[in-house]
Amino acid sequence: AITDTVYRVRIVPDAAFSFRAGQYLMVVMDERDKRPFSMASTPDEKGFIELHIGASEINLYAKAVMDRILKDHQIVVDIPHGEAWLRDDEERPMILIAGGTGFSYARSILLTALARNPNRDITIYWGGREEQHLYDLCELEALSLKHPGLQVVPVVEQPEAGWRGRTGTVLTAVLQDHGTLAEHDIYI
């Protein structure tokens, strides 16, 4: 577990797989119950697929998946799905917008985009109700030190004393920073 409600799960597949950054997989609970989860790993990471699963008593949908993983130590997945994958245009500035475990989708796109073009201008806005919901913020800040074009904007709705990031909602922060988004590639 990364936090008391967020789990980093690495699936080691039995067979070869491929996907594009930004796509998701379906965890097969039974024939009629398939549950979508964004992949946090990149297509270049061939040994595993990483998921960030927010599982708690208020999210029984995801908790049932985590319970199965913890009990059986294996799951069946259907991969890949989704059309919101990273496009090949590597020149335009990029904005990534994520909330909570939605960061997994943004992480896959971010790491892939930086591998393709380490100097690309990328801004990632990551919001959470509380600072603890930004569970991989240290990883992002370390990446921003290696990539001068990467700007990390953490946003917390209910900040504690000493919070140094932005407050409010992610979309408010984006709109405060950008008059227009027309010249950016945007992934939400």
Locations of regions flagged by a protein language model:
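Ferredoxin-reductase
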Residues: 1-73, 128-130, 155-159
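FNR/FR-type flavoprotein reductase catalytic core
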Residues: 47, 57-188
